[in-house]
Amino acid sequence: MPSRTALSPGVLSPTRPVPNWIARPEYVGKPAAQEGSEPWVQTPEVIEKMRVAGRIAAGALAEAGKAVAPGVTTDELDRIAHEYLVDNGAYPSTLGYKGFPKSCCTSLNEVICHGIPDSTVITDGDIVNIDVTAYIGGVHGDTNATFPAGDVADEHRLLVDRTREATMRAINTVKPGRALSVIGRVIESYANRFGYNVVRDFTGHGIGTTFHNGLVVLHYDQPAVETIMQPGMTFTIEPMINLGALDYEIWDDGWTVVTKDRKWTAQFEHTLLVTDTGVEILTCL
């Protein structure tokens, strides 16, 4: 299999329209978002709305994921996700968030996160992360997954499989009364078995009526975190796991984060609810 050349920015298509009847988050058209100090524990009413947002986000991710194949552009994946969201009455949360120009993130190969969909053509052997967030009913639902394109090298296929497994192991630790830090401990201990490195500077987050409510969910072991999980908390778990070192660079677009050594990376994400007895995944179909 020929080696993939390092990625570079493609050409952006025009901004996709959203029907006027679909409610926008407050930050659309503004340089910043009003967020970061909202309650971490949600009301039953907000939780029920988040179930709706989560299902729509999951549906958009599944539809876009089906299209991942050699020869497809990342802009086409954005079109599919965008149309699914608006057809279901949801606003694409990333569109206009701090100036982000597209309706989802598409992060290939060495892109850790926040890749912008453009004219980049997916090549046989690529791995493609799609990150979709739906805003409907005044709340957000956020999810992502990494999809293989064509014949993926064993090293990269295993990275994807193990990142998915690390994510699910972490989700299964969620329980009221348990320290939030156990999430990162489980992810990092599993990833370290294979010599992988867990990204530190980009984290999971609290989510609800705002995209990021101030709660930070680390994906690495940090016992100093004293937060205890409580029923009604909603947050994402979304580990990014690298084959190589943790050093990264950000492209001139201000968003796209790539590994400095250009080794590949994978990610999965769900929005979660801490229940009275454990966890509910809100971003499931």
UniProtKB/Swiss-Prot annotation:
<keyword id="KW-0645">Protease</keyword>
<keyword id="KW-0031">Aminopeptidase</keyword>
<comment type="subunit">
    <text>Monomer.</text>
</comment>
<feature type="binding site">
    <location>
        <position position="142"/>
    </location>
    <ligand>
        <name>a divalent metal cation 1</name>
    </ligand>
</feature>
<dbReference type="GO" id="GO:0050897">
    <property type="term" value="F:cobalt ion binding"/>
</dbReference>
<dbReference type="Pfam" id="PF00557">
    <property type="entry name" value="Peptidase_M24"/>
</dbReference>
<feature type="binding site">
    <location>
        <position position="142"/>
    </location>
    <ligand>
        <name>a divalent metal cation 2</name>
    </ligand>
</feature>
<protein>
    <recommendedName>
        <fullName>Methionine aminopeptidase 2</fullName>
        <ecNumber>3.4.11.18</ecNumber>
    </recommendedName>
</protein>
<dbReference type="GO" id="GO:0004239">
    <property type="term" value="F:initiator methionyl aminopeptidase activity"/>
</dbReference>
<dbReference type="InterPro" id="IPR001714">
    <property type="entry name" value="Pept_M24_MAP"/>
</dbReference>
<feature type="binding site">
    <location>
        <position position="269"/>
    </location>
    <ligand>
        <name>a divalent metal cation 2</name>
    </ligand>
</feature>
<keyword id="KW-0479">Metal-binding</keyword>
<comment type="similarity">
    <text>Belongs to the peptidase M24A family. Methionine aminopeptidase type 1 subfamily.</text>
</comment>
<feature type="binding site">
    <location>
        <position position="269"/>
    </location>
    <ligand>
        <name>a divalent metal cation 1</name>
    </ligand>
</feature>
<keyword id="KW-0378">Hydrolase</keyword>
<feature type="binding site">
    <location>
        <position position="205"/>
    </location>
    <ligand>
        <name>a divalent metal cation 2</name>
    </ligand>
</feature>
<dbReference type="GO" id="GO:0005506">
    <property type="term" value="F:iron ion binding"/>
</dbReference>
<feature type="binding site">
    <location>
        <position position="131"/>
    </location>
    <ligand>
        <name>a divalent metal cation 1</name>
    </ligand>
</feature>
<feature type="binding site">
    <location>
        <position position="114"/>
    </location>
    <ligand>
        <name>substrate</name>
    </ligand>
</feature>
<dbReference type="InterPro" id="IPR036005">
    <property type="entry name" value="Creatinase/aminopeptidase-like"/>
</dbReference>
<comment type="function">
    <text>Removes the N-terminal methionine from nascent proteins. The N-terminal methionine is often cleaved when the second residue in the primary sequence is small and uncharged (Met-Ala-, Cys, Gly, Pro, Ser, Thr, or Val). Requires deformylation of the N(alpha)-formylated initiator methionine before it can be hydrolyzed.</text>
</comment>
<dbReference type="GO" id="GO:0070006">
    <property type="term" value="F:metalloaminopeptidase activity"/>
</dbReference>
<dbReference type="GO" id="GO:0005829">
    <property type="term" value="C:cytosol"/>
</dbReference>
<dbReference type="InterPro" id="IPR002467">
    <property type="entry name" value="Pept_M24A_MAP1"/>
</dbReference>
<feature type="binding site">
    <location>
        <position position="238"/>
    </location>
    <ligand>
        <name>a divalent metal cation 2</name>
    </ligand>
</feature>
<dbReference type="GO" id="GO:0016485">
    <property type="term" value="P:protein processing"/>
</dbReference>
<feature type="binding site">
    <location>
        <position position="212"/>
    </location>
    <ligand>
        <name>substrate</name>
    </ligand>
</feature>
<dbReference type="InterPro" id="IPR000994">
    <property type="entry name" value="Pept_M24"/>
</dbReference>
